[in-house]
C-alpha cells in the first residue's frame, strides 16, 4: 500500500512539473552535433555500426565491443570561423567480467566574448561603448553509460545499453540551467549486417532554468520593452533513431560498409524529407571503405531540407539542400586518428569545418599484440 501511494505521488508531481514546462523542437541542440570524426564523416549514420567508445553518444549498446582494455576518445571542432568551439571526450572501461562496459562522456559547446549591450545606451540616450562587457555561453553534457550483451541467437548477437545524462547550460552570470534525461539503445550484430535502435531522451529530458539579473538590468529590460525572464522548465521530446548497415567484402583486404539511419521525431512538423504532424523523418546515409582495417575513407550525406534558392531573385523558389561530409582515418598500433570535412549547407556560401579525433586503446604493455 505504501509503495502504491509513493508511485501515485511521484506521478502527480511529474504531471504537475510538466504542466509548467514547455516542449521545444530544438532544445539542447548542441547534443545533436556528434562525437568522433568517423561519425561526422559518415554524416552521423552511426546507430548500427558504432563499436568504439563514442557509442556512449551514438548508441550505448555498441560499447560492448570495447573489450580487454579501456579506450579513450577525444575530439575538437570549431564552427562559424572559430566563433563556436566544440569538444568531446569519452572513456570506455570494460568491467571485470569483460561483458559489461562502463562509459563516461563529456561534451562542451561554447561561444566566448559575446558583447553584452544591455547598458550600451545611457539614460540620456547617448551611446557609451565603454559600457559593453563580454560574456561566454557554454553548454555541457555528462553521459554515464552502461552496456552489456543480452542474447545470442545463431549467428546474431544482441546487446543493449543505457545512458543517464546530466546537462548544464550557462550564459554568463545571467542564466543557468540544470537538467537530466535518459537514452536507451539496442544493437543486433551479424557477420555481414547490423541493426541499431536508439531512443534518445526516452523519458523526456528537461532543463530547469534560473536567472540572476541585477536591479539595474531589470530596469533596462522594463523600459526597453523586453520581457524579464523568470524561472522556467524546458522539455526535450523523445527521438527514435533506427538504422542498419551492410558490409560488402570486395576482396581479402578491402571492405565497403554502407549504413542508413532514420531519425524519427514526434514533436510536430519539421523541415525534413517526410514531414507530418505525427512524425517527421530525417534520413542519413554513410559509407566507409577500409583496407586491412588500417586505412579508412568515408563519406556521407544528411540534413535534407527545403530552402530558398540563393540564385532566385524573387526569393520564392525553394530547392532541396543537404549536408555532405567526407573523411579518412588510419590506425597505428593501438592509436586511431580520424578526420572529417563537413559543411553546414550546400548553398553558394557554405561554412566548412575540419574535425579531428583521436582514439587510444589503453593496452597494457604485456597485452600488446
Stretches with model-predicted labels:
Residues 22-369:
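Subset of outer-membrane beta-barrel
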Residues 1-26, 287:
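Bacterial Sec-dependent N-terminal signal peptides
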Amino acid at each position: 500500500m505504501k509503495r502504491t501511494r509513493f508511485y501515485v505521488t511521484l506521478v502527480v508531481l511529474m504531471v504537475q512539473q510538466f504542466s509548467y514546462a514547455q516542449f521545444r523542437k530544438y532544445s539542447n541542440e548542441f547534443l545533436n552535433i556528434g562525437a568522433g570524426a568517423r561519425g561526422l564523416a559518415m554524416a552521423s549514420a552511426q546507430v548500427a555500426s558504432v563499436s568504439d567508445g563514442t557509442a556512449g553518444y551514438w548508441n550505448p549498446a555498441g560499447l560492448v565491443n570495447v573489450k580487454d582494455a579501456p579506450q579513450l576518445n577525444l575530439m575538437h571542432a570549431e564552427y562559424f570561423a572559430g566563433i563556436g568551439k566544440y569538444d568531446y571526450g569519452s572513456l570506455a572501461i570494460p568491467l571485470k567480467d569483460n561483458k559489461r562496459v562502463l562509459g563516461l562522456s563529456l561534451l562542451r559547446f561554447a561561444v566566448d566574448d559575446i558583447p553584452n549591450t544591455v547598458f550600451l545606451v545611457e539614460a540620456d540616450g547617448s551611446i557609451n561603448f565603454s559600457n559593453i562587457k563580454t560574456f561566454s555561453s557554454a553548454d555541457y553534457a555528462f553521459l554515464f553509460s552502461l552496456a552489456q550483451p543480452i542474447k545470442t541467437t545463431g549467428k546474431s548477437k544482441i546487446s543493449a545499453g543505457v545512458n543517464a545524462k546530466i546537462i548544464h547550460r550557462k550564459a554568463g552570470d545571467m542564466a543557468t540551467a540544470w537538467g537530466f534525461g535518459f537514452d536507451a539503445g539496442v544493437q543486433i550484430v551479424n557477420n555481414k549486417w547490423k541493426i541499431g535502435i536508439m531512443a534518445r531522451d526516452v523519458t523526456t529530458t528537461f532543463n530547469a532554468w534560473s536567472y540572476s539579473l541585477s536591479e539595474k538590468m531589470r530596469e533596462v529590460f522594463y523600459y526597453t520593452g523586453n520581457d524579464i525572464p523568470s524561472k522556467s522548465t524546458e522539455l526535450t521530446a523523445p527521438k527514435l533513431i533506427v538504422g542498419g548497415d551492410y558490409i560488402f567484402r570486395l576482396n581479402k583486404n578491402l571492405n565497403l560498409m554502407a549504413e542508413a539511419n532514420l531519425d524519427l521525431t514526434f514533436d510536430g512538423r519539421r523541415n525534413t524529407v517526410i514531414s507530418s504532424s505525427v512524425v517527421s523523418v530525417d534520413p542519413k546515409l554513410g559509407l566507409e571503405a577500409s583496407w586491412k582495417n588500417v586505412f579508412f575513407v568515408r563519406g556521407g550525406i544528411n540534413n535534407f531540407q527545403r530552402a530558398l534558392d540563393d540564385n532566385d531573385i524573387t526569393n520564392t523558389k525553394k530547392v532541396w539542400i543537404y549536408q555532405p561530409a567526407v573523411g579518412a582515418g588510419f590506425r597505428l598500433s593501438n592509436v586511431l586518428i580520424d578526420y572529417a570535412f563537413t559543411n553546414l549547407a550546400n548553398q553558394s556560401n557554405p561554412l566548412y569545418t575540419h574535425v579531428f579525433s583521436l582514439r587510444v586503446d589503453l593496452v597494457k604493455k604485456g597485452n600488446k599484440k
